[in-house]
């Protein structure tokens, strides 16, 4: 019987689950509600295990065919131990060792990583990264996160804080406070939240009218509204879009001279803004970046969407067991 990989992408509302074959092709996917009633994490992880059992029982496989289980979690993860510290979206208290809890149910390998890292791994293997060994994924959503793949593996650093790219200091005036407690992080000026921050900061200085004036006054402005107005020629929104693009280009430049990726993959809701954002990023990136570091590097849009996390969770087993150890 062919071997399979089990994958879980744990979110604050739902958990996406899936079964993949040993070539990282998805065989099935489904979701369950995220149970946040248990602050130890045990109940949620048991629910995930039970759901895996139910779906395997309906298939042609048995649990003995499972090569391993990959799990993506929204919070800081110690990759070596499987510990998650501060998963506030799941209401877990203190440190939860996801690997140890799951190993109470199974005897196969269990790999755990941060959700942004696994999304990057998903794009590397099955998305816009085209299987390249050096890929950086940047997620532009309510916040800004991402992951760095170098020489085929996720960059974790000595304590799991490697590639926390949302906290690069780019706003040296430190105008906006970040959720991390510090000010000036790129997340405060180049995420969907950051777009609104910039609108509210610059609007009082406006010398011309804007089509989003009423949205600003009603405190209902959004990144989408800004980008849509920019496409329609609103000069204020074009200015904001260019500022955001410049910050993202600066981030891309930093990662280029640091890890020299083949692909810089832009994902998340803001990446769908279209050419008005992406082309501005590319232009400024080429102006900023050390020439050898940008040669043959492509800035591309993510392809997997909401499936990046579950694909990357399975990718943990594919990368660290099948590819690295040659196990099939």
From Swiss-Prot:
Q: Which principal EC class is assigned to this enzyme?
A: transferase
Q: Which SUPFAM superfamilies match?
A: Actin-like ATPase domain
Residues spanning the signal sequence: none
Superkingdom: Bacteria
UniProt keyword annotation of Magnesium present: no
Q: What is its EC number?
A: 2.7.1.2
This chain belongs to the protein called Glucokinase
